[in-house]
Structures are given as structure tokens and as C-alpha cells.
Amino acid sequence: MELLDKAVTDFQLFYQKILDLYESDFSPADKWTEIATHIHDNQQIPIGIYKLLRQNDTVNQIDIDYKSDLEQLNSKISLESDFIVKSSLIIASMHFIIYDMITREGNYSSIMYGSEEMNIPSVHNMIYYVYISTKNQQNIYFHAYILLFGLESIFNKKFYVGMDFEFTNKKIQLSQLNFEHNVSTKSIIMIVSPNELEDIMMNNFIKIIICNTNIKKILHGSDSLDIPYMYTHRLDGDPDKIIKFTRTLIDTRFLCEYYKLNSDIVSDNRCSIYDEDPSRSAVYFFKVISDEQQNKLAELLESMPAPHDIQWNIHKMPISQARYAAYDVLYLKVFYYRIIHVATEEDSSDIGKKNIIELYKHLLNEITRFVYLEQNGITLLMAKCKEEVDVVNNYFIRNSEGITKMIDIFNQVSLGLETSDPKVNVDSFSKVNHFKRPITTIIKRIVYGFISYRCRIYKDKSTIWTDKLDNQFIFDFLAKMKFNYLNKMFKELSKTLESRIVAICSVR
């Protein structure tokens, strides 16, 4: 209890200094510098509070008070005795102060208006403040802001961060991060150089943003450079950190590809998030941007070198390059929701729309996360499945129709597979190259598992294969990894597959 009391006292004193600086006679620029410096120099206090709050389930019952003004919040803080509630009030007050400071003219690099940049009425009141750390000493603003965002996420689990990275000769140069708040109409786009962040800044960024499962991270086409960079260089190949990061990762490229590949009116699956050619621009295809906005974007892109020729240097970025970098994350959250909205328009029934939302928000994201973990050797389910099926592909059964190889049984029983909860057509699912091999590998392993129990199998003309392949480890893995929708899908598929195999094999 003494430790808790000390933490509360320290946090309140920490906040009081922020309040004193905010109410001082300094200019807005000097206020923000002093506040950010104070937060940076005393980062152990908000980090300590973050750890304490994350360990307490009571936070799930409390909402941050975004409605009260600063005077009302300060009055509530002085009267409140409960540690959790008092902390939430202090965090609300910090939100009020920091969002006021960071959006004051002179304290940001540029500004983008939702009404000018996007064709979606729901974001026309949004303002995107772009901040670029052109000098190393300015990284304290990034540090102060992410500490606040991480603290807020303890009570507010509807945060998104749009993420992108820029590389020169495959070496990281920039991180662009669009911090999307579900209550505020102000979004903050931070552009920093990871190479120039102090260790404590990067460590806290990883801890309270990247590995924070309360915050969803949105990327687009991240498999070639972004994911390997994050897994290897930022998360140090640590499976625990990588799994936490990946658990709330969304890659909109694969949602876009799924939609296009399963649409009757689309002839290709090109999903560049934006492009000077309208036919290749995904945000234009899904009507996130208008004709006029597409033309403006095309003019910017035409003025730039080819993407692989761009030399990125955070200290020497022309306006066009800085705007290009901001666009990479500006659209991501809106684009994500727009894909889902467009997909739901193809079904008029409430249950149909619900099934589509479930597919896009959960199942497609889970399979994307699963594939990233498997491709990078963090989890090894596919490797185990492949190891067990490859050696028995040509083993066979005998029945009234003659000899049938196990691989042929798989090809026969895996046609036309569907599930009802979640509502999935496996053939549609497998049209996305990213998904095809993992889905096929797991289904094949399930099929061979049932064959091993239900059929008399021969290794050759005279040798019976007696091994039994239990499928339970697949479902145990999916449950452990919290791939709940994938788990339900494969369990339902397994029932269908078992019944089909029983019809083919002689039951012992």
C-alpha cells in the first residue's frame, strides 16, 4: 500500500508541474518545450503508473472524463481518493493540456484537413497535425506524446495508430505514425527517425505503443520491409514482444486484395494504397478520395522520384517529400473502415452485413497475423503440419474403387468447403496468395489426421501404416494464440472433413 500511495503522490506532483508550466506566462512554444522536457526527464513516473494500471482490472470499469474542462478536472482530482479514478482524471487533464499545446500554431510542422483530403463526410471535421522531428532535440515532443497516448489507452481501447516506414537502400530512415483518437477530432501524425531516438524513447515506444494490445496498429503491404524491420530490429526477435505487437496488427492490403479477388466487377487485385494512376489507387477505388483529390495526389506523386530512388533524410525533406510521407499514414484508419463498409453494401440483410463485418474485422486479420508469425519463424504450426503430411502424401487406402492416395483423398474432400460461424467460403479465402498455403497446409493436416484414425492405410503393397495423427494440437495452438475466429473456422471445417472421409474410408 505504501508503494501505491507513493506512486499516486508522485504522479500528482508530476502532473502539478505540467499544470504550473501550462498556466505560466511562457509563449505556447516555450510552454510545450518545458512540458515535454519535464515529461521526458521524469518518464519513470508515467511509465510506473502505466505498469500499475495495466495490472488492475478495475480500469475496465472506468471511462476517461473527456467532457469536463480543465478547472473541473482539477477540482475532481483534489477531491478523489481512489487511485484508479484519480489517475484517470490526471490523464484526462494531461490530454487537455498536451493536445492544446501540440496543436498550437508554431508547435507543429503542417496541418491537413479531413474535409480537403478525403471524400468521407464522417472525417470532414478531423484535423491532422503533422509533426516532424527535424532536430534531434525535438524528439522529446514525440516522447511526451506517446507517454500520454499509452496512458490514455489503458482506459480507452479504441485507439489506432497508422504506421509506415521509409527506407533508403533498405536501411530505415523514417517512421510515420498517425495517432488516431476516437474522442478528439485532432489526430497527431508524428514523423521521426528511429535511428536518432534515445534508447529510453525507443524502449518506451515499444513498451506502451507497439506491444500495447489495447492499441490497434494499421499498416499496408508491410510484409517485405516493415514487418522484418519491426520483428528483427525493433523487437529484437523476442517472440513475446512480437506476438504482442502482431496480436493487434492490421494490414489493409490483404483486406483490399480479398475484396477485389472476390468481386464480380473487378478485374485485378492491385492494391497500392495510392498511385498516380487511378486504376491502381486503392483509396480512389474505395472512394476514400474524390476525383479532385486523386488528381491532386497524382500531381504530388509525379513531382517525386520513383519510390526506390527517394533519398530519405529527416533533416533535409522538401515540402513535397514531407507531404508524401504523411499521406502514407493519413488514410489508413479511414481506408480500413471504408473497405469494410463497401463490402457490407453487397448484402442487404442484417445478418449478412454482420457476417461480412466479422469476416473483415476478425478472420482476415487473424489469418494475416498468423501468416506473419509463421513466415518469420516466430510460431511453427505450419512447419509441424508440413513435416507430418509430406512423408505420407503417397500412402494409400484400398476400397471398392481401388487404390486411392492420401493426397488424392485430400484433393477430393477439400473441395467446396464452407463454414457458417464464422461465415467463410474457403475457396474465396484462398484466392489471396498470402492465405492460400497456410490454409491448405492446415486443412491437409486435419484431413490426414482423420484418415489415420478412420482408414486402413498402406505405406506400400504389403506394409500397413499404423501411426495416428491427432489434430488437437492445431486447435490448442489457435486457442493459445487467441486466434478465436480461425479456431472456430477450423473446428467447423474439421467436422465436415471427417464426415467426408468416413464416406470414403472403411470405418474400423
UniProtKB/Swiss-Prot annotation:
Keywords: Virion
InterPro entries: RNaseH-like_sf, RNaseH_sf
Cellular-component GO terms for this entry: virion component
Keyword Membrane recorded: no
Domain of life, per lineage: Viruses
GO MF annotations, alphabetized: nucleic acid binding
Gene3D superfamilies, per database record: Ribonuclease H-like superfamily/Ribonuclease H
Keyword presence, Translocase: no
Protein name, per record: Uncharacterized protein L533
Upper lineage: Viruses, Varidnaviria, Bamfordvirae, Nucleocytoviricota, Megaviricetes
